[in-house]
């Protein structure tokens, strides 16, 4: 099985990364199960199939091909072709983002953080009337989820790590270390603050387990309401919007909800977690970055040098 081969070849990769690579490879294989990697031998055909994709997407597909091919010790010349594509796009990506300019797609969908936050406030007002209802319909649950997800991302701009299992503190404590490593958990103690335990994310091998205590008053209050009204007998934090019963098991499920809400509420703007991270950090640090760049020019060094050498705690 390819996943096992990749994991043996690259033990540092997280399950999230391996699953993303496998998903990309299935797409390159026309959506068919992967029995071998012969479809990657047609390099020109693969590049033609990706010709209309944005550069970051092409880079991700090329990287998936590299990981798979090197795991089975494929022809080095073929690996180099994909590596050259990835490296060129990495350089292009780095040079572009060094300018701090928005991509055309980001520009088309960008809103200021205050505008997005106002959207969340409006969604909160829309669900205010259901807070005292004892029984929630599917439509009510869907509407509340469409408020809660954007709210969470304005407070905690993670990637898409909110595919989570809800557990009590005692149930979490009974999990083995191996069980904890395999998932992301929303821990809701009877007493004390709620917190997130995140092990499955893109850079988990580098940064390890993340434990995030929830202390934002609006978010905590809204989550308490949600925990009371989620579909009974379920352990997922969020759900597929159709039916509101099936757990949201992929980051794509979260993205669909986020972009659907922003398109409806913000005049067609498509804002998922990735773009919202840019918007959030730009609002928080853009002026600071401009000041650092100006000071660095006067002082004759780079911003990176200023951060690493001159700025002290």
Regions found by a protein language model. Give the residues of each.
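Flexible interdomain linker/hinge and immediately adjacent N-terminus
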Residues: 78-134
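Short, basic interhelical loop/turn and adjoining N-cap
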Residues: 13, 172, 301-307
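Basic, Lys/Arg- and aromatic-enriched nucleic-acid-binding interface segment
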Residues: 118-160
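Non-catalytic DNA-binding core/recognition domains of DNA-processing enzymes
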Residues: 6-92, 254, 274-278
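Active-site/catalytic core of tyrosine-dependent DNA strand-transfer enzymes
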Residues: 205, 209-269, 274-275, 280
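C-terminal catalytic core of tyrosine-transesterase DNA break-rejoin enzymes
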Residues: 275-302
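A short, glycine-centered helix-capping/turn motif at helix boundaries
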Residues: 72, 142-146, 152-180, 287-290, ...
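Conserved tyrosine-mediated DNA breakage-rejoining catalytic core shared by Y-recombinases
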Residues: 165-217
């Amino acid at each position: 099985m390819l996943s096992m081969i990749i994991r043996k070849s690259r033990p540092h990769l997280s399950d999230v990364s391996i699953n993303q690579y496998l998903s990309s490879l299935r797409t390159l294989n026309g959506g068919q199960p992967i029995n071998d990697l012969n479809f990657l031998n047609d390099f020109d055909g693969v590049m033609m199939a990706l010709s209309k994709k944005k550069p970051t997407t092409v880079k991700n597909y090329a990287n998936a091909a590299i990981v798979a091919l090197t795991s089975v010790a494929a022809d080095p010349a073929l690996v180099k072709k994909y590596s050259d594509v990835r490296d060129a796009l990495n350089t292009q990506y780095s040079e572009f983002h060094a300018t701090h300019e928005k991509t055309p797609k980001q520009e088309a969908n960008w809103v200021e953080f205050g505008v997005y936050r106002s959207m969340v406030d409006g969604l909160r007002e829309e669900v205010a009337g259901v807070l005292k209802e004892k029984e929630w319909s599917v439509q009510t649950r869907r509407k509340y989820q469409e408020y809660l997800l954007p709210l969470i991302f304005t407070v905690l701009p993670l990637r898409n790590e909110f595919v989570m299992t809800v557990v009590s503190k005692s149930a979490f404590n009974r999990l083995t270390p191996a069980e904890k490593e395999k998932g992301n958990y929303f821990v809701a103690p009877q007493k004390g603050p709620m917190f997130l335990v995140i092990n499955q994310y893109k850079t988990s091998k580098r940064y390890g387990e993340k434990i995030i205590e929830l202390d934002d008053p609006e978010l905590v209050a809204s989550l308490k309401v949600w925990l009371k009204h989620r579909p009974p007998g379920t352990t997922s934090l969020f759900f597929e919007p159709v039916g509101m019963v099936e757990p949201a098991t992929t980051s794509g499920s979260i993205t669909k909800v986020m972009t659907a809400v922003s398109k409806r509420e913000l005049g067609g703007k498509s804002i998922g977690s990735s773009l919202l991270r840019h918007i959030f950090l730009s609002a928080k640090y853009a002026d600071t970055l401009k000041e650092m760049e100006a000071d660095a020019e006067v002082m004759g060094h780079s911003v990176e040098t200023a951060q690493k050498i001159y700025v002290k705690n």
